[in-house]
Amino acid sequence: MRVKMPRVKAAQAGRQGPAKRHLAEQFAVGEIITDMAKKEWKVGLPIGQGGFGCIYLADMNSSGSVGSDAPCVVKVEPSDNGPLFTELKFYQRAAKPEQIQKWIRTHKLKYLGVPKYWGSGLHDKNGKSYRFMIMDRFGSDLQKIYEANAKKFSRKTVLQLSLRILDILEYIHEHEYVHGDIKASNLLLSYKNPDQVYLVDYGLAYRYCPEGVHKEYKEDPKRCHDGTIEFTSIDAHNGVAPSRRGDLEILGYCMIQWLTGHLPWEDNLKDPRYVRDSKIRYRENIASLMDKCFPEKNKPGEIAKYMETVKLLDYTEKPLYQNLRDILLQGLKAIGSKDDGKLDLSVVENGGLKAKTVTKRKKEIEESKESGVEDMECSNTQTEETIQTRSRTRKRVQK
């Protein structure tokens, strides 16, 4: 089970000095917490710890204990910390179960990959106040599977994933938010259904259109290059606040990396200006981007068409999401497939799927269900090298 704790914007911390934050105290198994709606929840086993908070299995209060198959988790942070408070704002505005269900019904979707918000509140323990949020439980993240598959997904898998991500982006955009950091490590599989993918990490999501008024295009040198450097949008490189077109541009870069295992500017991620200039150069000539990334003759034309469509969007323009989905659906048709909702997360080998990888993946899913703790991101267990790399290349825009 993997749940991401929000991160503090690295660049901001560098300018102002690190904010003083406190670690969360351990909650006891079986402890009862009451949310703002007066609903009681029971805390289960701890399954991970972020930089300043803890994550536990959770379920509605009953006479029994919280089992290893609990459907929810609870994130806990000291109430004077900021990241969870920021994430809560998104969930309260845009992720209530009834909102998501209404969208699924009116748009005739099988599901929507936005985590559901089940409740939140403050809990006093030993004279200290803690903020908590109840949310869905998830399985493995896509980055781990991508790396296990030799950093490559099949064309069908990439198109299926991207269709579901477009569904997600349309929803959060219509609710006045942009994500700004779409990438494999922020995409988690459903705990019960490995064919469903969810976009997480809204701790620093940006409200681009409060009360229906779009933020104006404004370059801020202090915000230059915010985001995950290899994927972030050209707008973000220029210090402009995230917008809808930026999310779609980021998805385009993700699709290319998932198909090929690399992006043309990954040879020099330490130089953000080089990365920005490379993206600008390739945006002006999408054909050259395709030639660079797909040197073989059989290029995925739908990717080029998608990128060409996205680059024409103005900063405040509302995308035509169905047009973008239609482009990807044409790609599925071109390879003799269709949108069947199946995510076959295995690598292509000689035109076929590696049976060993498929078997291994099914086994991993079953083990994850049994343990409930696999793939939990724990900041305290990351290697020093990983932490240093992320601090150099992964910054987020804070609302």
Per-range role (PLM):
Residues 2-38, 44-45:
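Juxta-kinase regulatory segment immediately upstream of eukaryotic protein kinase catalytic domains
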Residues 173-191:
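Catalytic-loop of the protein kinase fold
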Residues 56-100:
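ATP-binding glycine-rich loop module of kinase domains
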Residues 192, 234-296:
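Conserved C-lobe activation region of Hanks-type protein kinase-like domains
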Residues 104-156:
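Conserved structural core of kinase catalytic domains
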Residues 188-226:
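Activation segment/activation loop of eukaryotic-type protein kinase catalytic domains
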Residues 44-50, 55:
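Protein kinase glycine-rich loop
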Residues 161-162:
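Activation segment signature within eukaryotic-like protein kinase domains
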